Amino acid sequence: MTDIKQILTDLIRFPSITPEDAGCQKYMIQFLEQLGFTCQQLNNGPVSNFFACYGKIGPLLVFAGHTDVVPVGEVSKWDTDPFSLEEKNGVLYGRGVADMKGSLACMLHMARRFIKTYPSFPGRLGFLITSGEEGDEFNLGTPYVMQKLEQQGIVIDYCIVGEPSSSLKAGDIIKIGRRGSLSAKIHLSGKQGHVAYPHLADNPIHRISPVLAELTSMQWDNGNAYFPPTSMQITYIHCGGHAGNIIPGELNLHLNFRYSTEQTDESLKTRVINAFTHHNLNPAIEWRLNGEPFLTNKGILLESCKQTVLEHIGTLPELSTSGGTSDGRFIAPYGVEVIELGLVNATIHQVNECTSLQDLNTLETMYFSICEKLLID
């Protein structure tokens, strides 16, 4: 029988740099179909997606994840071939071993073991997999699949996202939510002119400066028990001109908010627009909602996960909402209990990305135990 390491070896061989899947999902679908899963591919443009389900009735527990990985960077800086799994002293190296093909290998191995142990369990086990998580095509992935499932009347009860949530060892941190992300591209027009004749020009830098001073000093909220205060960062400023004696005629500015459940995207938009209005400016603003905040601070899934972690590593997990966004933000709005439980994130997106064989085995065992609690007990 193929063990977890061999499954991971197979997955790492696919150079699935986002949004390319490169054969990962074909491998996973074949694996799951051999176990009796019904699989449907839901590809969308350059992004590959599939949903798989075992069982006909009862609560539906879905394991969600992505097959795409970030680029490897300079291959010469790797100590190993990034697309060939290599073990050194119990540590496994390769692009995606932690984020998140290691979790996928645990999910597949667990599914086979669970179905062999409980072939007629009173529930349903599912997989929701995309190759569009790491890049700009994320809207073609999980949110698209969720729309299709809703159209088919498929309701997910519980979802475990296999993102690398842990800090020192598998299970020490569970993500119970994530902050929302809102971006703005702002264009402010002025009038180009010579610096010696400012009365004949209109400098957009000068005009926007008091607005930026107001926005960067603003206390958006105080956060709450689960989220830190909302933050805003200026991520890009560019003006025309490119000469020391020219007043630029336009300015482009990008902002990003990471916001708590104390805010909504509309409340943030209103405050930004009001700041510009207060200074008699009316720029063109293009908004992009990358994801709303979500929180699973209670429920059967969370309690099952907490108890499972305690049983397997001896301590209760830290419950956190820190870090960037994840695809959980597209699943939670459908009323699903969502948590993230995965491997250690210390080396994700880095050269020599790695995870330990011990953590893989621990994570697989925890996934199995959670399935028992939700689908058997």
Curated annotation (Swiss-Prot):
Organism: Legionella pneumophila (strain Corby)
UniProt keyword terms in alphabetical order: Amino-acid biosynthesis, Cobalt, Diaminopimelate biosynthesis, Hydrolase, Lysine biosynthesis, Metal-binding, Zinc
Coiled coil: none
Alphabetized GO MF terms: acetylornithine deacetylase activity; cobalt ion binding; succinyl-diaminopimelate desuccinylase activity; zinc ion binding
Catalytic activity: N-succinyl-(2S,6S)-2,6-diaminopimelate + H2O = (2S,6S)-2,6-diaminopimelate + succinate
InterPro entries: Bact_exopeptidase_dim_dom, DapE_proteobac, Peptidase_M20, Peptidase_M20_dimer, Peptidase_M20A
Cofactor mode of binding and number, as noted: Binds 2 Zn(2+) or Co(2+) ions per subunit.
Required co-factors: Zn(2+); Co(2+)
Function: Catalyzes the hydrolysis of N-succinyl-L,L-diaminopimelic acid (SDAP), forming succinate and LL-2,6-diaminopimelate (DAP), an intermediate involved in the bacterial biosynthesis of lysine and meso-diaminopimelic acid, an essential component of bacterial cell walls.
Family note: Belongs to the peptidase M20A family. DapE subfamily.
Protein name, as recorded: Succinyl-diaminopimelate desuccinylase
UniProt xrefs under SUPFAM superfamilies: Bacterial exopeptidase dimerisation domain, Zn-dependent exopeptidases
UniProt-annotated catalytic positions: D68, E133
EC number: 3.5.1.18
Gene3D superfamilies given in the database record: Zn peptidases (3.40.630.10)
Pfam families linked to this entry: M20_dimer, Peptidase_M20
Biological processes annotated in GO: diaminopimelate biosynthetic process; L-arginine biosynthetic process; lysine biosynthetic process via diaminopimelate
Pathway: Amino-acid biosynthesis; L-lysine biosynthesis via DAP pathway; LL-2,6-diaminopimelate from (S)-tetrahydrodipicolinate (succinylase route): step 3/3
